[in-house]
Curated annotation (Swiss-Prot):
Gene3D superfamilies: 3.30.70.2860, CinA-like (3.90.950.20), MoaB/Mog-like domain (3.40.980.10). This is Putative competence-damage inducible protein. It comes from the Bacteria. Coiled coil: none annotated. Belongs to the CinA family. Pfam families: CinA, CinA_KH, MoCF_biosynth. It comes from Streptococcus agalactiae serotype III (strain NEM316).
């Protein structure tokens, strides 16, 4: 089904409010297998809204109008839609009774004729009762096009959509099912390059890449009658994707760290540690506790994480971790030696299975001759200690710190999975 959203309200065009309803509705319609082709905002003007309705009626099967259902003269959505369709306005009995109760319980408010506008419906509409407000919504069909009228305030629109609109539109047949694959260690441009043939020939399912700070996600989407049918199609596409290799011959499946919109590298590592009954600690310099903070963000972190160290200065590294100051001066705080020593000392001091050491140059200035974005990450395990050097150039100080923690978590992930 082709659909479009028309947001009615001059306050949207003047930037006084943000049109969050469009994002919410687009997401919900997509879940129902309804394709939003257009989004438009129009002011509180009858002539312009009539013009837009004329355009929408010729290109869409479902037209969703948000806003303009209030009691004032500039709330003209239902009135304009009725005029466009050549229909009259009727009063919805339930909405009218709600107005009665509202004003009966608030004698300090005067009820005026304008208030009755909130209980009006376009003739022939299926009413959508407003659970958190006074203005009734509705769905009316004319010449093969459905018109849905919804209130503007999100606190009124969202309950109406979730509790009334979704059940009505769920009979549409197919729904949209999605699966999000999360990758670390490859950029969006390279991922799109190696997926070029698949993307070029895609029909259903489809692939949508998204670049995030330090990682890339792929959203696989398909329309299906049920979850089993969707899983069959998505499993096949995922298998085809993960069989590929990067331009430098790494297995793409090894760069996949998790699934879902709300997942993260920290959550993935936490769950792996819990499953394997392992513990972890960290000593951080440039990240200043960010690694530990991300780990502790999730419930159950205390099962695998007892604490750690933030050792920003050379003195702190020496005093708290017991790393000889002469060695730090010899090798420098930005070095493989220091990253490994931090990881090893932290692991031994807190008797953890894994220790992480993070040191480097967050920026913007150089340190010890290294440019901003130079990071050394050490990992200590029962099998030994090692480290990597990462160059995160052209990023803000905040991004350097965040991406550094992703690399650290990935080291732990690979160690746990023995990749």
């Amino acid at each position: 089904m082709r659909a479009e959203i028309i947001a009615v309200g001059t306050e949207i065009l003047t930037g006084q409010i943000v049109n969050t309803n469009a994002q919410f509705l687009s997401e919900k319609m997509a879940e129902l297998g309804i394709d939003i082709y257009f989004q438009t905002a129009v002011g509180d003007n009858e002539e312009r809204l009539l013009s837009l309705l004329d355009i929408a009626s010729q290109r869409s099967q479902l037209v969703i109008l948000c806003g303009g259902l209030g009691p004032t003269e500039d709330d003209l959505t239902k009135q304009t839609l009725a005029k466009f369709l050549g229909k009259s306005l009727t009063v919805d009995l339930l909405a009218s009774r709600k107005l009665d109760r509202f004003f009966a319980s608030r004698p300090q408010f005067a009820r005026t004729p304008n208030n009755e506008r909130q209980a009006q419906l376009v003739e022939g509409s299926i009413p959508l009762q407003n659970l958190t407000g006074l203005a009734v919504g509705g769905i009316v069909t004319s010449k093969g096009v459905q018109y849905m009228v919804l209130p503007g305030p999100p606190s009124e629109l969202k309950p109406m959509v979730m509790e009334q609109v979704v059940p009505i539109l769920s009979n549409n047949g197919t729904k949209l099912y999605s699966r999000v694959l999360r990758f670390f260690g490859i950029g969006e441009s390279q991922l799109v390059t190696i997926l070029e043939d698949i993307i070029k020939n895609q029909t259903d399912p489809t692939i949508a890449p998204y670049a995030k700070v330090g990682e890339v996600t792929l959203r696989l989407s398909t329309k299906a009658e049920n979850q089993d049918e969707a899983d069959f199609k998505l499993d096949s596409l995922e298998k085809e994707i993960l069989a590929l290799k990067t331009l430098d011959n790494r297995k793409l499946k090894d760069l996949l760290y998790g699934y879902g919109d709300n997942n993260s590298m920290a959550r993935t590592v936490l769950e792996l540690l819990k499953v394997q009954n392992k513990t972890i600690t960290a000593a951080e310099s440039l990240t200043a506790g960010l690694f530990q903070s991300q780990l502790a963000e999730f419930s159950g972190a205390s099962q695998v994480f007892n604490g750690g160290f933030t050792t920003y200065s050379m003195e702190a590294k020496s005093q708290l971790l017991g790393i000889p100051k002469k060695k730090l001066q010899e090798y420098g705080v930005v070095s493989h030696f220091t990253a490994e020593a931090m990881a090893q000392q932290a692991r031994q001091l807190l008797k953890a299975d894994f220790g992480i050491g993070l040191t480097g140059v967050a920026g913007p200035d150089e340190l010890e001759g290294y440019p901003a974005g130079t990071v050394f990450i050490g990992i200590a395990t029962p099998e030994g200690v090692s480290s990597i050097k990462v160059s995160i150039g052209g990023k803000s100080r905040s991004d350097v710190r965040h991406i550094s923690t992703l690399h650290a978590f990935d080291l732990v992930r690979r160690a746990l999975l023995k990749i």
